[in-house]
Each structure stands twice: as structure tokens, then as C-alpha cells.
């Protein structure tokens, strides 16, 4: 009961390598779902878009639990922004990101796309559901050389550094508005006891 459209999308990977195993772009499709009843009678309903990539999404049976999850979530964040940049039919006023997996989007929007005429006016809201999960690593045991301050440029999708990027910190750092699941949790995570080493940053924001 769905109407579907497909369009190709080239997502930059920021790869600096000439190695063919590290492509400069990943090709995705954007699938648009519109209920058939709404497509025919013109009623206003929620339209859903899905970013598709055979290697990083279609071949996987689960949402989480892969060694390259950081690449998969980075691709999603960058892919969403590339779709909005190249699609001339629709643009949101606000993008809502949730937890470390989409904190990269807030980062990209305020750095890579900060001067883009089409995207720079979009506001971002970052929702914290569980501050404990901050990336593909245990944030409590990070070597000094692997520490992510949230300000350095995002690495290439294929750089080993991508596995050490703190998506939670970057979402908090770059979002326009930060919110969480309850007023109580909002107060708790601004304390050393529950702040998971981000309480200082949260207080600053």
C-alpha cells in the first residue's frame, strides 16, 4: 500500500586516498514512501524517506552490532544532508537527531555545510536518551591520543579515527538545542555522578 520513488545520491566520504578500496563517494538511493490513498486524493500525511545502500544497510540483518557501525551512522548523517542539499522540492526547518548515532549530523551541518545557502538556516535539536553510550568505544577508558574533543574535523569514513569519534559529544557541541527524556534526567546528567564525563560540556551549553 505504498507509492515508491527512487533517486541516486552521491555521498562524499572525504577520503584522501587514491586507493580504489576507499572511494571518494558512496552511492545511495533515497526511497520515498507515500500512502497510495494520499497520493491520489491529495491529503496531507507523513511522507517517509529511507536512505539505501547495499553494502552498509541492505546486507545487514540488524540495526546495531557491526564493527563498521561508525561508518554506517556517518553515512546516514552525511547522506541526509546531501539529499536535502540536492533535493529542490522540500527542506525542513528543524532536524531532530537522537543519541550518538546521529550526533554526526549536527556536526556536519555546522561545519562542512555551514556556508551552504540551502542548508545553513536549518536548526538542529539533539535528544539525549542515554548519555552512557557515546560511540564505538568505552568513553571512560580512552587513550590521550584517541580523545575526541568534538571540535576537530570529521575524519574520512574509512579512517581508523572514525571509530574513536564521540558522536554524543559532537551532537551536544554542535546542536542548536539540546533536550532529553525528562527534566529529572536533564538535571542528573549535569552532575559528575551521572554526567559520563560530559557534565561540564552540558553545563556550558
Task: Cite the ranges covered by each PLM segment.
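Catalytic cores of nucleotide-sugar-dependent glycosyltransferases that transfer UDP/GDP/TDP-activated
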Residues: 1-205
Amino acid at each position: 500500500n505504498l507509492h515508491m520513488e527512487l533517486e541516486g545520491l552521491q555521498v562524499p566520504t572525504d577520503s584522501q586516498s587514491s586507493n580504489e578500496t576507499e572511494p571518494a563517494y558512496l552511492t545511495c538511493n533515497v526511497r520515498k514512501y507515500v500512502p497510495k490513498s494520499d497520493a491520489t486524493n491529495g491529503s496531507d500525511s507523513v511522507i517517509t524517506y529511507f536512505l539505501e545502500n547495499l553494502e552498509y544497510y541492505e546486507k545487514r540483518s540488524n540495526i546495531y552490532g557491526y564493527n563498521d557501525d561508525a561508518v554506517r551512522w556517518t553515512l546516514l548523517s552525511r547522506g541526509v544532508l546531501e539529499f536535502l542539499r540536492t533535493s529542490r522540492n522540500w527542506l525542513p526547518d528543524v532536524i531532530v537527531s537522537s543519541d550518538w548515532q546521529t550526533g554526526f549530523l549536527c556536526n556536519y551541518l555546522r561545519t562542512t555545510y555551514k556556508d551552504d545557502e540551502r542548508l545553513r538556516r536549518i536548526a538542529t535539536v539533539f535528544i539525549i536518551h542515554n548519555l552512557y553510550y557515546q560511540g564505538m568505544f568505552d568513553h571512560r577508558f580512552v587513550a590521550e591520543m584517541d580523545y575526541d574533543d568534538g571540535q576537530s574535523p570529521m575524519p574520512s569514513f574509512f579512517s581508523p579515527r572514525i571509530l574513536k569519534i564521540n558522536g554524543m559529544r559532537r551532537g551536544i557541541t554542535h546542536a542548536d538545542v539540546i533536550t532529553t527524556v525528562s527534566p529529572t534526567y536533564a538535571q542528573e546528567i549535569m552532575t559528575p555522578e551521572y554526567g559520563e564525563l560530559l557534565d561540564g560540556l552540558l553545563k556550558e551549553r
